[in-house]
Design a protein with these regions (language model features):
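Second-shell loop/turn segments in exported
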Residues: 25-31, 72-79
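Short consensus segments that form the blades of beta-propeller domains
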Residues: 31, 80, 241-245
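Loop/turn elements at helix/coil->beta-strand transitions in domains of secreted/extracellular proteins
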Residues: 48-52, 85-86, 231
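Short helix/loop segments within enzyme catalytic domains
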Residues: 21, 33-35, 44-73, 98-116
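Pan-zinc metallopeptidase signature
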Residues: 73-196
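Zinc-dependent metallopeptidase catalytic helix centered on the HExxH motif
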Residues: 1-55
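Solvent-exposed loop/turn segments at secondary-structure junctions
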Residues: 7-8, 14-17, 90, 96-97, ...
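Acidic, Ser/Thr/Pro-rich low-complexity intrinsically disordered segments
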Residues: 106, 115-135, 189-265
Length: 265
């Protein structure tokens, strides 16, 4: 219940650009999905006061499962595309009363609420572990180095002494993970590709190596800066086939820093 309420809270009081869909700890996910699901898992443990996420189901709630929030699940993936990594990071930051861990940071649920409602919404980047951590850093600037160390412990931001909301310096390209058929994605990075208004077109590739709809590299992200108020035209065309279609029709969405969105389908 807390997990699902968390989705409601983030949608109504903060920002959440997750596309939803099926997910598990072994999935390499769209980073928006990884953040949304991992954060909601951690919230459940924080609110209830349990270092495990517990989900019940069936007649009389007689079945279900639980996931540890203080350690990595035995066959989960690690990285910015992992809901397990996100859950552990969020839980470690805000488990202020926990004596069960040795992490070096303990912020409060009030701090998390401030980060989500005041600092996350104005951030231009989409909702991922990177934009969330930037919002937390703005809430608690003195915790910056500890937040970075926590990211590094989950194979995130390994090659940098700083991090930003875009994941600009990310080097974890998910190449350590293969699909059921032995494939590896080559389209995980950069997380956000720079696009310059008026410049040459940018080639951006997608794939379904690790599954479809909400998995890593199914959708790609770009960023751009508009310097002047004017009318601008954006155009996307396919250069090949994919996802079982002989003639793909690319769709794209444009989001402004104020949260306004435009769809081209």
């Amino acid at each position: 219940v807390v997990h699902e309420w968390g989705h409601f809270f983030s949608d109504q009081m903060s920002r959440d650009f997750s596309v939803g869909g099926p997910h598990s700890l072994t999935d390499l996910l769209d980073p928006r999905v990884a953040f949304s699901e991992g954060w909601a898992n951690a919230l459940s443990g924080l609110v209830i006061g349990n270092d495990r996420y517990i989900d019940t189901s069936g007649q009389g709630q007689s079945s279900g499962f639980s996931i540890p929030l203080e350690r990595t699940y035995f066959d989960s993936v690690s990285g910015w595309y992992s809901e397990d990594s996100v859950a552990q990071i969020v839980f470690d930051i805000f488990d202020e009363t926990s004596a069960l861990d040795d992490d070096e940071i303990q912020l409060s649920l009030k701090d998390m609420t401030v980060a989500l409602t005041e600092h996350l919404p104005p951030i231009a980047a989409t909702t991922t572990i990177f934009s969330f951590m930037k919002a937390v850093e703005e809430t608690s600037p003195q915790s910056s180095s500890k937040l970075l160390n926590l990211l590094k412990s989950h194979e995130i931001a390994l090659a940098t002494d700083d991090f930003d909301e875009w994941g600009s310096s990310e080097t974890n390209d998910a190449s350590d993970y293969t699909s059921a058929t032995g494939g590896r994605t080559s389209n995980a990075l950069p997380i956000h590709t720079e696009m310059t208004v008026g410049a040459d077109p940018v080639l951006l590739c997608q794939d379904a190596v690790h599954g479809e709809y909400n998995k890593l590299a199914n959708r790609r992200f770009m960023k751009m800066t508009i310097e002047e108020t004017a009318s601008y035209r954006f155009y996307a065309e396919s250069t090949g086939t994919g996802f079982g279609r002989t003639s793909p029709d690319p769709d794209f969405y444009i989001w402004g820093t104020n949260g306004t969105g435009w769809a081209a389908e």
